[in-house]
């Protein structure tokens, strides 16, 4: 038995590399190993399986799948398939998703018995009942690569109960990744749902009760689910994509640290007031959790001391002062520490004549600090007035999703240039609060960046991947230039 380890998300190129298949899939030769084995391939030298030709190259000829044994109840395991190559040799193909094993066996005695039983099965009049037979037996139209991809897709659907989506269609797998969506259409966990798939002309019905939260929790180390289209993004590459959904282009939330890394040149970030923490000024107590305990919990969870990071750095060589709010820390709520850190940042920039960027992501004033949190609105606005009106310096406000409450009512809307991210939720009061207060229905989409842009609420809507270049041009337009010309990108 020869075993190949494989990942549950495969492209054709990855499959070809792992199994010794070449890109020339029009004609496949005898199944076997490539002459140069990888470390992750386990070779059983006792098996006499043909190599890829005399030269050790990967040139191929046709492989004919005999049947998928799902059509024969109880014959062999549901994840085993029988194929035949151009030399007439038969092989059984076995998939084990849980243990990530791909096995090929050419035990002739076993396979002869298997084929004999299969022939008997077919002669008993079951040809028409077996959906795999009519389409695949001795049919060179479907290549080995297409067949294996379809088998993996069908196995993924049934084994781990996910809805697979093949980008290039159900009949042509030659250029497609197998993208797996865990409950891609949001299904109520209390309802019984059915997935209906077409497998080579037959309908495969899978019924079960799905629990979205359990599934997301199970696979969250691999995937990030889009809030807009519910598609899955591979977590390993998600950060390099700037947290933008590959399926629909939706901008998902980013941590403050990721935003700093996105905007600030490498090695130039110098944080300010990192040791400043809240002391629970009004001794707010909740039946559920003490305010201090909640602060400590978020500090451990996020690695931050408060809901904003402030500091100085360079953006394409231009010295700037920047504050970035983090929605992951108590919803980015603005308390006395957040207000103090932003005020000190603006005052520092005023004294050094630096441009200021503040990235807003907040639910508003922090209720656990009462009127002290509301006071921060006036304090920051006062510092901003001196910076902008008296010193004539340049302040850019960037509104991300969500920006609401006291932040919207103060420094969020005070920028000389106000930039919004696509699809950002921007409001003073939330939809539910407005509807309950005024007894009026708030239209869907009336608090999104695109709608508010047409109402003149801010200046441009800038996608994340273009933001750094736009900011650099704005600063140079307003007289802030790189420390050296080589820094311009």
UniProtKB/Swiss-Prot annotation:
Q: Does the keyword Transmembrane helix apply?
A: no
Cofactors that this protein relies on: Zn(2+)
Going by the record, the broad EC class of this enzyme is: transferase
Q: Which GO terms describe its molecular function?
A: acetyl-CoA carboxylase activity; ATP binding; carboxyl- or carbamoyltransferase activity; zinc ion binding
Q: Give binding positions for Zn(2+).
A: 226, 229, 245, 248
Q: Which UniProt keywords are given for this protein, alphabetically ordered?
A: ATP-binding, Chloroplast, Fatty acid biosynthesis, Fatty acid metabolism, Lipid biosynthesis, Lipid metabolism, Metal-binding, Nucleotide-binding, Plastid, Transferase, Zinc, Zinc-finger
Against Pfam families, the record matches this protein to: Carboxyl_trans
UniProt-listed PROSITE patterns: COA_CT_NTER (PS50980)
Ranges that cross the membrane: none
Q: Where is the CoA carboxyltransferase N-terminal domain?
A: 222-489
Major subcellular location class: plastid
Q: What cellular-component terms does GO give this entry?
A: acetyl-CoA carboxylase complex; chloroplast stroma
According to the record's subunit comment, the protein's assembly and interactions are: Acetyl-CoA carboxylase is a heterohexamer composed of biotin carboxyl carrier protein, biotin carboxylase and 2 subunits each of ACCase subunit alpha and ACCase plastid-coded subunit beta (accD).
The record ties this protein, via PANTHER family, to: ACETYL-COENZYME A CARBOXYLASE CARBOXYL TRANSFERASE SUBUNIT BETA, CHLOROPLASTIC
Family of the protein in this entry: Belongs to the AccD/PCCB family.
- Protein's name in the database: Acetyl-coenzyme A carboxylase carboxyl transferase subunit beta, chloroplastic
What gene does the UniProt entry assign to this protein?
accD
């Amino acid at each position: 038995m020869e075993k190949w380890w494989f990942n549950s998300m495969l492209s054709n190129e990855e499959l070809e590399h792992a199994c010794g298949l070449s890109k020339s899939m029009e004609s496949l030769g005898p199944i076997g190993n490539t002459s140069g084995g990888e470390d992750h391939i386990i070779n059983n030298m006792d098996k006499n399986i043909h190599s890829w030709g005399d030269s050790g190259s990967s040139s191929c000829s046709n492989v004919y799948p005999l049947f998928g044994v799902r059509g024969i109840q109880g014959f062999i395991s549901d994840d085993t398939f029988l194929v035949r190559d151009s030399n007439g040799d038969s092989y059984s193909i076995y998939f084990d998703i849980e243990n990530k094993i791909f096995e090929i066996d050419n035990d002739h005695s076993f396979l002869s018995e298997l084929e004999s039983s299969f022939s008997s099965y077919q002669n008993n009049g079951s040809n028409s009942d077996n959906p795999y037979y009519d389409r695949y037996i001795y049919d060179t139209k479907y290549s080995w690569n297409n067949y294996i991809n379809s088998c993996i897709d069908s196995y993924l659907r049934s084994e781990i109960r996910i809805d697979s989506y093949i980008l290039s269609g159900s009949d042509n797998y030659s250029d497609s990744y197998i993208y797996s969506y865990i409950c891609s259409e949001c299904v109520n966990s209390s309802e019984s749902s059915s997935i209906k798939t077409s497998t080579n002309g037959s309908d495969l019905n899978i019924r079960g009760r799905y629990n979205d939260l359990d599934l997301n929790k199970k696979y969250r180390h691999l995937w990030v689910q889009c809030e807009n289209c519910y598609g899955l993004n591979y977590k390993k590459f998600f950060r390099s994509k700037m947290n933008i959904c590959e399926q629909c282009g939706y901008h998902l939330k980013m941590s403050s640290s990721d935003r700093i890394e996105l905007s600030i040149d490498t090695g130039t970030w110098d944080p300010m007031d990192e040791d400043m923490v809240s002391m629970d000024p009004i001794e707010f107590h909740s039946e559920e959790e003490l305010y201090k305990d909640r602060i400590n919990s978020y500090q451990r969870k996020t690695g931050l001391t408060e809901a904003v990071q402030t500091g100085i750095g360079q953006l394409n060589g231009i010295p700037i002062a920047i504050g970035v709010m983090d929605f992951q820390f108590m919803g980015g709520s603005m308390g006395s520490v957040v207000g103090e850190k932003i005020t000190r940042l603006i005052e520092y920039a005023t004294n050094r004549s630096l441009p200021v960027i503040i990235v807003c992501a907040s639910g508003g004033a922090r209720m656990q600090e009462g009127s002290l949190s509301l006071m921060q609105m006036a304090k920051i606005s006062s510092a901003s007035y001196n910076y902008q009106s008296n010193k004539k310096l340049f302040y850019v406000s960037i509104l991300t999703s969500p920006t609401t409450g006291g932040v919207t009512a103060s420094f969020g809307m005070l920028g000389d240039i106000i930039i919004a991210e696509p699809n950002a939720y921007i409001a003073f009061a939330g939809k539910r609060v407005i509807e309950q207060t005024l007894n009026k229905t708030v239209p869907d989409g009336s608090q999104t960046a695109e709608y508010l842009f047409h109402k003149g609420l801010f200046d441009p809507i800038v996608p994340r991947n273009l933001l750094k270049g736009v900011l650099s041009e704005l600063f140079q337009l307003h007289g802030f230039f790189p420390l050296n010309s080589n820094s311009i990108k």
